[in-house]
Amino acid sequence: MPLSKNVIEKISIETIRVLKSRFDTISDEDIKIRNMPFHMAFLRAFYGKIGINDDTEALKFLTLSQWFHGLSTTLGQSYFENIAHILSNGEKRTFKNYKIKRSVRDKISEIINDLKSGERLPNVEKENKELREATSKNSEYVNGLEFTADVYFEDKDKVVMIELKTVRPNAGEMRGEKQKILYGKAYMMETKPNKKVYYFIGFPYDPTENPENPCGYDKDRFMSSLIEFSKYFDKREVLIAEELWSFLSGEENTMKKILDIINSIAKPDFKEKFDFINTFPFINQDRLYTKDAIDEQKFKKYMDILQEWRLYSEIECAKAVKELSLLKLSSRDRRTFERLINNSMFSNNNKYNENRKMKILELYNKYMQK
């Protein structure tokens, strides 16, 4: 079953937002070749290793690396998380100032210490059983460890939480991540005792996979590439690459579909197309409400871009604008319509202007019902 048009459009909008924000943060000054003598001095030792031929290529490499770092930060801090929420109908949720039983806290400390010392191997089923038993004991309550689930969603019979990580997490942070996950599961087990509780750690792609197979993954290989990861985590509590994205959506091949959406938008002419569709360029505003209100050639170009970028509801909005531009509107509705068509699809801070679309469609439906 394919992703719904609504989900696809939301992914497209999020992709456009990220691309536009990256264009906004890279000035002509940022892409100039800069003087970096110390970086260059060290980098020359690696020319053969990374396939750089000369200093000119090296300076371009350093400049691109700085920009790429910013893109990686944007993807890790917002894009992956927002796409996960779109696919799962979930949200980010923080838990603090809560209480757990002392017996639970002691059990978590025991599990963590045993994993650290190597006295036990990670086993998610055994750990869950021990946590359930600890929550059922008669024990005083103590403060729990604050935690945030990057993705949280809840069904009738289960609670699912996911910690989204970069594919190269910092060495030494695995112990803390495991501890946080155990606290999160224990708290949910006590507050929602009749529901199954899952807390995964998720990675958006597998960097150890062959680039010719971007959606593929080898969980064992990936886990072994991270310092102390297998020491604390059972592979059953890890979601990676296609496995993660399809789990979130409930549909197969979701990662490929996400990449297809990105690839349809992220092209060299992105900025040119964005600037064209961000307003309604096909309207001849000095000829509104006449047969010459629409520039048909520009309208076709506008619609082609919306179709290519999978902005399905904006296609309906554009059709409504075309119809309304030819109608005899009341003076009050004219004022509303004229203000709406001078709004942008994306604001200066790159926020999608859904209100513009909704108000235009509302006005259109009002006249179509007459």
Curated annotation (Swiss-Prot):
It comes from the Archaea. The keyword DNA-binding applies. It catalyses: Endonucleolytic cleavage of DNA to give specific double-stranded fragments with terminal 5'-phosphates. One of its GO terms (biological process) is DNA restriction-modification system. Coiled coil: none annotated. Keywords: DNA-binding, Endonuclease, Hydrolase, Nuclease, Restriction system. One of its GO terms (molecular function) is type II site-specific deoxyribonuclease activity. It is an enzyme of class 3 (hydrolase). Its EC number is 3.1.21.4. Pfam families: RE_TdeIII. Belongs to the TdeIII type II restriction endonuclease family. A P subtype restriction enzyme that recognizes the double-stranded sequence 5'-GGNCC-3'; the cleavage site is unknown. This is Type II restriction enzyme MjaII. The gene is mjaIIR.
